[in-house]
């Protein structure tokens, strides 16, 4: 099941294995950890540049005690929360989170979130994403991607390909 919800109404997962080193697992502490150690400022910049979450990158949450707890997508959720409400940005990081336009605020104010029934149902998803990981393209496939999209200047420009791929 999927619902449309504001990222501000989502809770970051206090049981996320990334946060094992945190002594306090309040939402503000989790956000500070994510911006300090998990490159969330860059992710917020990327979301701001793109204008929304990338297609296919839906957040996954559990419905627990009348709250929605993110089990997959804590970094994306944190980024969106800080883009939507600058008061949530931890001290010392405001200069690293871009100011957003009205259109981006509109695009990100309500997002589609997949809802799972219990934490056990999230285990397979988390394993595939964080332990097995997405299989990277081999070098030849990467070359083919750039060649097919550049097409001797008839397709994307080198600048556009660099912006799209980060290479």
Where are the language model's segments positioned?
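Short, charged/polar connector segments at secondary-structure boundaries
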Residues: 1-101, 109-113
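Amphipathic, charge-rich alpha-helical segments that serve as recognition/docking helices
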Residues: 26, 31, 94-167
């Amino acid at each position: 099941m999927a619902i449309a919800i504001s990222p501000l109404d989502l809770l970051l997962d206090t049981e996320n294995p990334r946060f094992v080193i945190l002594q306090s697992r309040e939402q503000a502490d989790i956000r500070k950890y994510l911006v300090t150690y998990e490159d969330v400022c860059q992710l917020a910049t990327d979301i701001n540049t793109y204008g929304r979450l990338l297609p296919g990158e839906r957040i996954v949450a559990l419905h627990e005690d009348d709250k929605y707890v993110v089990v997959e997508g804590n970094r994306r959720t944190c980024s969106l929360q800080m883009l939507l409400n600058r008061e949530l940005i931890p001290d010392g990081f405001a200069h690293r989170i871009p100011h957003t336009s009205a259109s981006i605020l509109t695009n990100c104010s309500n997002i589609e979130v997949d809802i799972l029934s219990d934490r056990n149902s999230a285990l397979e998803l988390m394993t595939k994403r964080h332990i097995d990981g997405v299989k990277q393209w081999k070098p030849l496939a990467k070359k083919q991607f750039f060649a097919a999209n550049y097409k001797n200047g008839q397709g994307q420009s080198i600048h556009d390909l660099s912006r799209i791929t980060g290479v």
